[in-house]
Amino acid sequence: IAGYMHDIGNAINRTHHAEYGGLLADGILKKTDMNIKDRITIVSAISNHDESTGGAVDLVSAALIIADKTDVRRDRVRSEKGKAAFDIHDRVNYAVTQHKLKVNVDKKTISLNLQIDTKICSMYEYFEIFLGRMMMCRGAADMLGATFKLMANGSKVL
């Protein structure tokens, strides 16, 4: 449920969308027969999933953070904008030509492997936008008792 609702706050504003999302989700979930403990877990995960204000506070928030922050790929970009209208976030996502997230339960690793077209976006630009997100994934993996690994264009980064 947290994963499904986590970006609902964008309906109000991109800035502080996690906090707005927590408030909106709480209002919606109050109308269900969900018990308070589960509702708090979901609202907390939504409220803490943004790198500017949040972090992993429990297993659910850790899983949400990893799922959200590792979702970097070309098809996230709406192509009708045209490349000339891409901002840096669009360009970074568009530059990712391959992505693979792998969880190895036995080795307790969560690995993200990206292939980035450096003709579209430099590695510097990628890390300017995504380093904080990848560090947040590392903290979330720690919360899950795992190690987060990042490979970009065949090179180990984290």
Could you say what each language-model-derived stretch is?
Residues 1-103:
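Divalent metal-dependent catalytic cores for phosphoryl transfer on phosphate-bearing substrates
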Residues 74-158:
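Terminal helices and disordered tails flanking the catalytic cores of nucleotide-processing hydrolases
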